[in-house]
């Protein structure tokens, strides 16, 4: 009798957890925040549905994907569960593009430290500019 009761109790608990998680639907919207020459820069906004109707301000997390300024994607599937976790915790998550200036780098051109250092600094400056534009877009549209 005791084992059966515990089993039923656990099954009910799991069912209620699954229902609660399912009820917390995350909405994703994609916006273009800048066009720079051939690059169209977009951002994805993740927010829990019940937070959309509210008028109370929510904290925003601006996420920068990794990739050493050579590659990466704002919508990499590996990040989505992290975005959903943060959205369920009450944050608005914004994952943004930025120009990856080192993606087409000719390694032979930058074989010396000074040449590579210059290219890296240019890539960082470009990414910072893009994050500034994304931040301005978020502020203007909040």
Please place each PLM-identified region on the residue numbering:
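N-terminal cap/lid segment of alpha/beta-hydrolase-fold proteins
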Residues: 23-56
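Short amphipathic alpha-helix adjacent to the substrate-entry channel of hydrolases
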Residues: 75-95
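Short, solvent-exposed loop/turn and secondary-structure capping segments
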Residues: 55-57, 72-75, 105-107
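Short beta-strand element of the alpha/beta-hydrolase
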Residues: 56-67
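Alpha/beta-hydrolase active-site loop signature
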Residues: 68, 100-102
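Bacterial Sec-dependent N-terminal signal peptides
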Residues: 1-26
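Serine-hydrolase catalytic-loop signature spanning alpha/beta hydrolases and amidase-signature enzymes
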Residues: 68-71, 93, 137
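Alpha/beta-hydrolase active-site loop
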Residues: 109-142
């Amino acid at each position: 009798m005791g084992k059966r009761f515990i089993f039923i109790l656990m099954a009910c608990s799991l069912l209620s957890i699954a229902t609660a998680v399912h009820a917390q639907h995350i909405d994703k919207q994609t916006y273009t925040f800048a066009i720079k020459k051939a690059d169209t820069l977009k951002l994805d906004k993740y927010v829990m549905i019940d937070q959309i109707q509210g008028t109370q301000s929510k904290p925003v997390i601006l996420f920068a994907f990794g990739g050493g300024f050579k590659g990466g994607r704002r919508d990499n599937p590996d990040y989505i569960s992290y975005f959903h976790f943060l959205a369920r915790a009450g944050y608005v998550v914004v994952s943004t593009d930025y120009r990856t200036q080192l993606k087409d780098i000719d390694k032979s051109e930058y074989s010396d430290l000074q040449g590579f250092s210059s290219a890296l600094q240019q890539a960082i400056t470009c990414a910072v500019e893009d994050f500034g534009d994304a931040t301005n877009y978020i502020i203007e549209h909040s």
